[in-house]
């Protein structure tokens, strides 16, 4: 088997850093989980873009007469939350769907609930916290309408991220409970060390892939397009 080379994040060649993770949805994730895993990845991307737009909104806030603290914190949130959210909640759910690991699911639930709370706080927008939420934006309309309109864009985006995060958490929890997952299974994986054993993880991944392929390749009853009628010669 060829060695997997880290390919994420895809950094430009002029940056003297190498990718830290290997990510290949089609190769790692079973087909039945592929769609949900990609949606969570897109949610992470949306959250990252929202943090970047929030930086622009805080710059408009600063230009319009707001304090420099918000702009500084917005920059900090961008460089801090973008990689941390990927490592802390997306990688666990990626690994959970890849290896069917209850421990990884629990790690995702714990960190993603924190992400949901943060998203709600960002959407609310407490002044001085470095986010253009509803309170900060609405209150700034009386000071500078132009800046407030720019601030309204990340405010709406933070709200969308919060709503999508709640939906995503509900979908993953519904799947996990429906598949028979539980906290006791996560404790068992932690006790036995199965959550960090590469051989156990590979076996679980192969089993999941095999089950998915078996379901897809299951023969189905073929029916003729031409009806066949049988007549009796008895009167």
From Swiss-Prot:
State the membrane topology.
Answer: Multi-pass membrane protein
Cytoplasmic topological domain ranges are 1-39, 89-102, 170-235
Which is one Pfam family of this protein?
A: SCAMP
Specify the domain of life of the species encoding this protein.
Eukaryota
Q: Which residues cross the membrane?
A: 40-60, 68-88, 103-125, 149-169
GO MF annotation list: protein-containing complex binding
Q: Name one GO biological process term.
A: positive regulation of cytokine production
Subcellular compartments:
Cell membrane; Golgi apparatus membrane; Golgi apparatus, trans-Golgi network membrane; Recycling endosome membrane
* Tissue expression remark: Brain-specific.
So which stretches are on the Extracellular side?
Answer: 61-67, 126-148
Q: Predominant location of this chain? A: membrane
The alphabetized UniProt keywords are:
Cell membrane, Cytoplasmic vesicle, Endosome, Exocytosis, Golgi apparatus, Membrane, Protein transport, Synapse, Transmembrane, Transmembrane helix, Transport
List, alphabetically, the GO terms of the cellular component aspect.
Golgi membrane; plasma membrane; recycling endosome membrane; synaptic vesicle; synaptic vesicle membrane; trans-Golgi network membrane
Q: Which InterPro entries match?
A: SCAMP
**PANTHER family per the UniProt record, alphabetical:** SECRETORY CARRIER-ASSOCIATED MEMBRANE PROTEIN 5, SECRETORY CARRIER-ASSOCIATED MEMBRANE PROTEIN SCAMP
What role does it play?
Answer: Required for the calcium-dependent exocytosis of signal sequence-containing cytokines such as CCL5. Probably acts in cooperation with the SNARE machinery.
Family membership noted in the UniProt record: Belongs to the SCAMP family. SCAMP5 subfamily.
Subunit structure of this chain's protein: Interacts (via C-terminal part) with SYT1 and SYT2; interaction with synaptotagmins making a link with the SNARE molecules. Interacts with SLC9A7.
Q: What is this protein called?
A: Secretory carrier-associated membrane protein 5
* Organism encoding this protein: Mus musculus (Mouse)
Identify the coding gene.
Scamp5
């Amino acid at each position: 088997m060829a060695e997997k080379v880290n390919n994420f994040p895809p950094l430009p060649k002029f940056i003297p850093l190498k990718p830290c993770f290997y990510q290949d949805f089609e190769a790692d994730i079973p087909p039945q989980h592929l769609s949900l895993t990609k949606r969570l990845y897109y949610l992470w991307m949306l959250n990252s873009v929202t943090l970047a737009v929030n930086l622009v909104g805080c710059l408009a806030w600063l230009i319009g007469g707001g304090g420099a603290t918000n702009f500084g914190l917005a920059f900090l949130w961008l460089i801090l939350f973008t990689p941390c959210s990927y490592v802390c909640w997306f990688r666990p759910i990626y690994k959970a769907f890849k290896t069917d690991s209850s421990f990884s699911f629990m790690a995702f639930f714990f960190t993603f609930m924190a992400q949901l709370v943060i998203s709600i706080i960002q959407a609310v927008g407490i002044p001085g916290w470095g986010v253009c939420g509803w309170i900060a934006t609405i209150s700034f309309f009386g000071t500078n309408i132009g800046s407030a309109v720019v601030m309204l864009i990340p405010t709406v985006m933070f709200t969308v991220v919060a709503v999508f995060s709640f939906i995503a958490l509900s979908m993953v929890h519904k799947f996990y409970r429906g598949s028979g997952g539980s906290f006791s299974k996560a404790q068992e994986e932690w006790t036995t060390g199965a959550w960090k054993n590469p051989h156990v993880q590979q076996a679980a991944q192969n089993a999941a892939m095999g089950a998915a392929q078996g379901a897809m390749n299951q023969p189905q009853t073929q029916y003729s397009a031409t009806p066949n009628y049988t007549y009796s010669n008895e009167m």
